[in-house]
Amino acid sequence: MLPPGADSVVVRHGDVGVKSSHVQSDMERTLRDNVAAMLADRGVPGDVEREWGRVLVRSPAPGRAADAAADTFGVVSASPAVSVAPDLDAISDALAAAARAHYDGGAFAVDARRAGTHDFDSHDVNRVGGDAVWAAVEDDFQPVVDLDDPDITFFVEVRDAEAFVFLTHRDGPGGMPLGTQQPLVALVSGGIDSPVAAWESMRRGAPVIPLYLALGDYGGPDHRARAEAAVRTLDDYAPNHDLSLRVAPAGDAIDRLAAATGRTRMLSFRRFMYRVAEHVAEHAGAAGIVTGEAVGQKSSQTTANLGVVDRATTLPVHRPLLTWDKQRITAAARSIDTFRDSSLDVGCNRLAPRQPLTAAPIESVRADEPDALFEWARAVAADTGPVEVAVA
């Protein structure tokens, strides 16, 4: 619902507000720029401003602008609003107009917040604003005030230079503005989990460098196509960042690895994969690696085996989904729109041995894997490059 005359969007952040004033200022500027980039990417007209504690959008299309802002990392919520003078008369007039346009009976409430210096407080806004709503609709309805469980709430936010009247909050992803953390290499397999892990890392402010290992006979065109589709979707959330997919030509190395290993094969494969990611990260200036692993989801993802594969790299391995159930991961994939293109079994399942070890000693893994495994990883990383991902 849009209030009559809506011309603005009030954009709120969360964790940014608990930072020191210097850090908050920097993060708010980044958030402002990211919201502006999201609007431009979607063809939504508007000017984006930063005020302390808020980002404001001035737009002739406030509904579309609010939707774009609500898809921006770091945004907790966005509300299409009408901007008025910060005085009780102007606020009351805007509330009365909103009530005449949208109140259709039942209980209502006025919920006001105020920041800055005024000759009234939020209780005054609630009282005077409630009277204005009541007077606007009492001839046609029998209005009821219910502050605990209203059918419709009229929101007011008063700031130093203006006030905003609005009716809805459009939830955003929260987190931190993208670009406020160092980038991470995100291993993207084409399965359900890895795009969600990459998205969660982006939600906490870290741009990702997507890395896909082309597995040769153990993958295939459909396998790579799912990874490309996932990256296209992730790119929609980062219009002012480069999410070019890096493809590592690992097929020959995987063939040699499969021929040389037995029950520890998947652990050696993951160690090889981490080492490729480490070299790519070093070249790209990334601070770590992101994977979609969750404890116990597969034999290679037991707590013991995760420790074994971690020892293949000196970089931190971030696992945003570490404690998530599969149902939660699947729900998140549906929510961010990566589920459809990543819901089929991925090629690396065909690489797994029949009876994989669930708690392999590191000595056994090292003894079983080829001595040149990490040299293969270095060579594969050297041949890794960005590829063009076609727009669907």
Swiss-Prot record:
Record-annotated membrane-spanning stretches: none
PROSITE patterns: THUMP
GO biological process: thiamine biosynthetic process; thiamine diphosphate biosynthetic process; thiazole biosynthetic process; tRNA 4-thiouridine biosynthesis
RNA-binding keyword on record: yes
GO cellular component assignments: cytosol
Single annotated GO MF: tRNA-uracil-4 sulfurtransferase activity
Binding sites annotated in the UniProt record for ATP: 187-188, 270, 292, 301
Leading EC class: transferase
Keywords assigned by UniProt, alphabetized: ATP-binding, Cytoplasm, Nucleotide-binding, RNA-binding, Thiamine biosynthesis, Transferase, tRNA-binding
Keyword flag Flavoprotein: no
Chief place where the protein resides: cytoplasm
Annotated localization: Cytoplasm
EC number(s) per entry: 2.8.1.4
InterPro entries (alphabetical): Rossmann-like_a/b/a_fold (IPR014729), ThiI_AANH (IPR020536), ThiI_fer (IPR054173), THUMP_dom (IPR004114), THUMP_ThiI (IPR049962), tRNA_STrfase (IPR003720), tRNA_sulfurtransferase_ThiI (IPR050102)
Known catalytic reactions: [ThiI sulfur-carrier protein]-S-sulfanyl-L-cysteine + a uridine in tRNA + 2 reduced [2Fe-2S]-[ferredoxin] + ATP + H(+) = [ThiI sulfur-carrier protein]-L-cysteine + a 4-thiouridine in tRNA + 2 oxidized [2Fe-2S]-[ferredoxin] + AMP + diphosphate; [ThiS sulfur-carrier protein]-C-terminal Gly-Gly-AMP + S-sulfanyl-L-cysteinyl-[cysteine desulfurase] + AH2 = [ThiS sulfur-carrier protein]-C-terminal-Gly-aminoethanethioate + L-cysteinyl-[cysteine desulfurase] + A + AMP + 2 H(+)
Metabolic or biological pathway, per its Swiss-Prot or TrEMBL entry: Cofactor biosynthesis; thiamine diphosphate biosynthesis
Domain THUMP stretches: 63-169
HAMAP family xref list: ThiI
Family recorded in the similarity comment: Belongs to the ThiI family.
Function recorded in the entry: Catalyzes the ATP-dependent transfer of a sulfur to tRNA to produce 4-thiouridine in position 8 of tRNAs, which functions as a near-UV photosensor. Also catalyzes the transfer of sulfur to the sulfur carrier protein ThiS, forming ThiS-thiocarboxylate. This is a step in the synthesis of thiazole, in the thiamine biosynthesis pathway. The sulfur is donated as persulfide by IscS.
Protein name, per record: Probable tRNA sulfurtransferase
